[in-house]
Regions:
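Conserved "right-hand" nucleotidyltransferase catalytic core of DNA-directed polymerases
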Residues: 1-11, 53-55, 72, 83-85, ...
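Polymerase palm active-site segment centered on the conserved acidic dipeptide of motif C
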Residues: 181-210, 404-418, 498-536
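Short, contiguous acidic/charged loop-to-helix segments that flank catalytic cores in large enzymes
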Residues: 9-13, 68, 266-271, 306, ...
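Conserved catalytic core of nucleic-acid polymerases
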Residues: 109-115, 161, 165-168, 221-224, ...
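Short glycine-rich phosphate-binding loop at a beta-alpha junction
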Residues: 33-40, 203-205, 322, 386, ...
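A short acidic-Thr-Gly-centered motif at the start of a beta-strand
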Residues: 26-30, 302-317, 471-476
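Conserved catalytic alpha/beta cores of large enzymes that bind or transform nucleotide phosphates
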Residues: 33, 310, 316-331, 342-377
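Conserved RNase H-like, two-metal-ion catalytic cores of nucleic-acid enzymes
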Residues: 1-79, 83, 288, 332-334, ...
Length: 536
């Protein structure tokens, strides 16, 4: 049966002695037993805030469910309770009591007031949470075996510990530069607004379509119209339009976004004592890729002014290790045929080879970025007409595609094969044995199946690498500390110097390359520097 360890309830005489409660929590968290939880990273961060270091193993029923069925409309504890045991969470009465007692908005927004509620009111809800979590765990075990996802769920559960320690560290920020950059952007905003006003002959609201339309009409600048007859001033159009008015509006919008989204809305809001604490979502997308939030570090501009804000700990250096061209390499791993085998042999001999430079031999006049676009189009099911539009015209598009498929026909064959498997078997598995389900999927979803295979595999590789570097002691909590995982890159702060640093970086690369055996080897680039910009 469950019980509630109650302490720190505001003004409640039934509170357990705080030190006794914390000592008991410490005892539980340091046991080698399995800890079954729901949203483990969130709860364990509170535990760590009390100076308690929880020990693995952990099992998170919400993470497990994402591996069992990636298409649930909700992965909340209440939603899974309804699915597995026919019983969800009903906290309405508790939230209503808090609303009546403390005011504010109704519903879940009252969660922050629960500590102020009496123990006798909170205890039943707390016990239901614990009981529901265990009931779901027991029910899930049957489905885990049936779906044959034991291996990938084990990986996700072993990932909880290193990500927990990573999240708790935060990343040191150059707060002086942060303040200075905020001031620079304010001055820049005034200059850009003044320039726009001079071009338009009046003040223009860059977020009001009608106002922009009027400015364009006054200057006789053409603009696209939607099917419904409305003007369209998208970011892509403004960026591609050569008219000074379009460029000025685009610059103003970009400046505003940088100010609101990154300086005021992200960095300043989440920096505490000189460190930025971002949230990391272990399965942040249907592909199982990780994501970050509050703030989303993946959206940090590729701009020195912003990336220089992220700095190493005092007296240390940052190390960045980034998978090079992981998607095309993983795609080639799945390809077959004589031509594919020849390309694999080349990469096995020289793993550092530039994938896109090789692909460009099929069309020497094509730029690197265009060739990347062509490859992704072939893999991810983009039509010839759509791709030709991006390439400029149908004739050019057809020529480039023809040359590409003639030189590298195995990529198109891979795409066709994967879609065929989805239609017949109704699921595919990634390199880490992650199951991607297609039961009842429509043709549009199946058309993009290779995306799931490649993106899901890239997620598996990064996660396995993190678990391995943690378990093998390559990263630790002393002199080689993991700070962030952003796309295909890990960022580390280290006090190591000279040969010790070189050895650690070599080991980091080795672990990342060897995460999973692939017929086309992975390649990792690592660099060191004082800040995030330097390591690129």
């Amino acid at each position: 049966s469950s019980f509630y360890v109650a302490f720190r309830h505001d003004g409640d005489s039934s509170n357990m002695d705080e030190q006794v409660a914390l000592d008991y929590l410490k005892y539980l968290m340091e046991l080698p037993n399995l800890k079954v939880m729901a949203n483990a990273n969130f709860d364990l961060r509170f535990v760590m805030a009390e100076g308690i270091i929880p020990k693995a193993p952990f099992f998170d029923v919400l993470l497990a469910e994402r591996c069992i069925n990636e298409y649930r409309s909700s992965y909340s504890l209440g939603a899974l309770g309804e699915i597995y045991v026919g019983e969800g969470k009903n906290e309405d009465a508790l939230y209503e009591w808090c609303h009546q007692s403390f005011g504010g908005r109704k519903g879940r927004s009252q969660a922050g007031n629960i500590w102020r509620a009496p123990i006798k009111l909170v205890e039943p809800y707390a016990r239901v949470d614990a009981e529901l979590t265990l009931d779901i765990y027991n029910k899930q075990q049957v489905l885990i075996k049936q779906a044959e996802v034991i291996e990938i769920i084990d990986l996700e559960m072993r990932l909880i510990e290193p990500l927990l320690h990573m999240t708790a560290k935060g990343i040191r920020m150059d707060t002086d530069k942060l303040k200075s950059l905020g001031g620079e952007l304010v001055v820049e905003s005034r200059t850009l607004t003044k320039t726009l006003t001079q071009i338009a002959g009046r003040v223009v609201n860059v977020n009001a379509g009608r106002d922009i339309q009027r400015a364009f009409d006054d200057l006789g600048v053409p603009y696209p119209i939607t099917d419904k007859g409305n003007p369209s001033f998208t970011a892509d159009f403004l960026k591609s339009c050569d008219a000074p008015i379009a460029q000025a509006i685009s610059a103003c919008r970009k400046n505003t976004k940088l100010m609101s989204s990154f300086i005021d809305g992200a960095y300043k809001k989440y920096v505490v004592n000189g460190r930025l604490y971002a949230g990391f979502n272990q399965i942040g997308a249907v592909t199982a890729r990780m994501s970050s939030s509050k703030p989303n570090l993946q959206q940090t501009p590729r701009d020195a002014r912003f990336r220089e804000l992220f700095i190493a700990d005092e007296g240390e250096v940052l190390v960045g290790a980034d998978y090079s061209q992981i998607e095309p390499r993983l795609a080639l791993h799945y390809c077959s045929g004589e031509q594919a085998d020849e390309l694999k042999e080349l990469f096995n001999k020289t793993p550092e080879s530039d994938f896109y430079a090789i692909l460009m031999t099929s069309a020497p006049d094509v730029e690197r970025q265009t060739m990347k676009m062509v490859l992704l189009a072939q893999l991810y099911g983009q039509g010839e007409a759509s791709l030709s539009l991006k390439l400029g015209d149908a004739v050019t598009g057809k020529r480039i595609l023809g040359s590409f498929n003639s030189s590298f026909p195995f990529f198109r064959r891979l795409s066709d094969t994967v879609r065929g498997v989805c239609r017949t078997r109704k699921y595919i598995r990634t390199v880490g044995k992650r199951r991607c389900n297609y039961q009842g999927a429509d043709s549009v979803v199946i058309h993009k199946a290779v995306n799931r295979l490649i993106q899901g595999g890239a997620a598996d590789i990064m996660k396995k690498a993190i678990v391995d570097m943690w378990n093998q002691g390559v990263v630790n909590n002393t002199d080689f500390k993991l700070l962030a995982v952003i796309h295909d890159e890990v960022i580390i702060t280290t006090s190591l110097k000279g040969d010790d640093l070189k050895c650690a970086m070599d080991e980091l690369e080795r672990v990342m390359v060897e995460a999973y055996p692939t017929t086309c080897p992975m390649h990792v680039d690592s660099n060191k520097g004082d800040n995030w910009w330097d390591i690129h």
